[in-house]
């Protein structure tokens, strides 16, 4: 009788454990992504050389919950080993890793051989990670642009084949696909989505990857006029309409305010950053800040002091609430563990680097 009671209790406990941990879906994954940052830990020689696992701890302490790991070169054994080191560091410190492939040759010349190269690149990466690291995401093509802007059929074909190949290896892997025109939200509707893919496929899009740069002789942001704010709001609304229509969720893979690592942020930059972050958070769209080297000195293992207030606004903005008068806002608390971690500068251990990429930051 006692054995029966124990067995029953174990079955109930097992059922409760399963009930407490629902299966990972794209919607829940998007919630977990929160605010992240684009990193060059696997793209540039300097980024590879300077990576220290404790940097991930510093990022988490600052409130960063995911990193977009940009990769430019072939998936050699050394590079795959380095990627695994990055992913393991992220898992250790509670940061979600997303690998993003630049696919430059394909973007410049979307011919059949280059299509195959992209697919094979991801097959190699997918095989290497197998079904491990369930929170690891794959961002298939970083900012589709150049000649690919004029070949939608090729882009959708590569996405279709790559998604199938990856899910033949790991059916649960979270995958991001981006539209043309450097991931413009207005082009989301051109993406060909596999049937019943809402639970594992997310869209990546973004605006202002390097801030509100001059376009056609005008800056899209000066003092934050009503027209400037409406233009940004409308682009975010375009993505929200696509989400509602398709049932898919999306992620802003990178936005910035312009060069900020050597200068004290201007009032205009702070206002722009606050508005962008608040609009995205109101829309419940996760996003990554572009980019790590603007805010973090990898060689010193410490945050750059000048742009730190700007980064804080981008991560945890103080937003007006509906019906509240502008300026009457509660201060948003910083990350709970922000003041506890010893900076990575205290660590002298550096990761061994594979043959690095000569790519420079975008």
Regions found by a protein language model. Name each.
Residues 239-309:
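Substrate-binding cleft of secreted/luminal carbohydrate-active enzymes
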Residues 241, 312-336:
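Aromatic- and carboxylate-lined catalytic core of secreted/periplasmic carbohydrate-active enzymes
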Residues 1-7:
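Sec-dependent signal peptide recognition
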Residues 14-15:
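N-terminal signal peptide c-region/cleavage motif recognized by signal peptidases
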Residues 119-220, 225-258, 282-288:
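Active-site region of glycoside hydrolase catalytic domains
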Residues 22-174, 179-191, 309-318, 322:
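Active-site mouth of glycoside hydrolases
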Residues 35-51, 111-113, 212-232, 265:
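Acidic/histidine-rich helix-loop elements
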């Amino acid at each position: 009788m006692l054995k029966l009671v124990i067995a029953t209790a174990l079955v109930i406990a097992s059922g409760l454990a399963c009930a407490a941990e629902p299966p990972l879906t794209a919607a829940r994954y998007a919630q977990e992504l929160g605010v992240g940052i684009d990193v060059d830990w696997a793209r540039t020689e300097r980024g590879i050389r300077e990576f220290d696992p404790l940097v991930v701890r510093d990022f988490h302490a600052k409130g960063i919950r995911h990193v977009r790991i940009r990769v430019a070169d072939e998936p050699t054994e050394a590079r795959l080993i380095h990627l695994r080191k990055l992913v393991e560091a992220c898992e250790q410190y509670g940061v979600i890793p997303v690998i993003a492939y630049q696919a430059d040759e394909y973007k410049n010349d979307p011919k059949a051989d280059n299509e195959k190269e992209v697919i094979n690149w991801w097959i190699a990466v997918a095989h290497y990670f197998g079904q491990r690291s369930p929170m690891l995401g794959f961002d298939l093509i970083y900012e589709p642009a150049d000649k690919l802007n004029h070949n939608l059929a090729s882009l959708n074909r590569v996405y279709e084949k790559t998604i199938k190949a990856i899910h033949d290896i790991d059916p649960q892997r979270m995958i991001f696909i981006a539209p043309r025109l450097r991931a413009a939200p207005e082009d989301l509707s051109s993406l060909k989505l596999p049937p019943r893919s809402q639970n594992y496929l997310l869209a990546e899009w973004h605006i202002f990857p390097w801030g509100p740069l001059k376009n056609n002789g005008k800056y899209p942001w000066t003092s934050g006029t009503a027209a400037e704010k409406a233009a940004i709001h409308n682009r975010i609304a375009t993505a929200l309409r696509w989400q509602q229509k398709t049932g898919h969720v999306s992620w802003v893979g990178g936005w910035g305010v312009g060069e900020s690592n050597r200068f004290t942020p201007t009032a205009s930059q702070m206002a722009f950053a606050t508005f962008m972050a608040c609009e995205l958070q109101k829309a419940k769209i996760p996003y990554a800040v572009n980019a790590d080297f603007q805010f973090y000195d990898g060689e010193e293992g410490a945050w750059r002091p000048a742009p730190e207030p700007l980064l804080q606004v981008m991560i945890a903005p103080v937003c007006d609430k509906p019906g509240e008068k502008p300026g009457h806002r509660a201060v948003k608390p910083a990350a709970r563990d922000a003041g506890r971690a010893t900076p990575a500068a205290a660590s002298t251990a550096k990761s061994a680097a594979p043959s690095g990429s000569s790519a420079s930051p975008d």
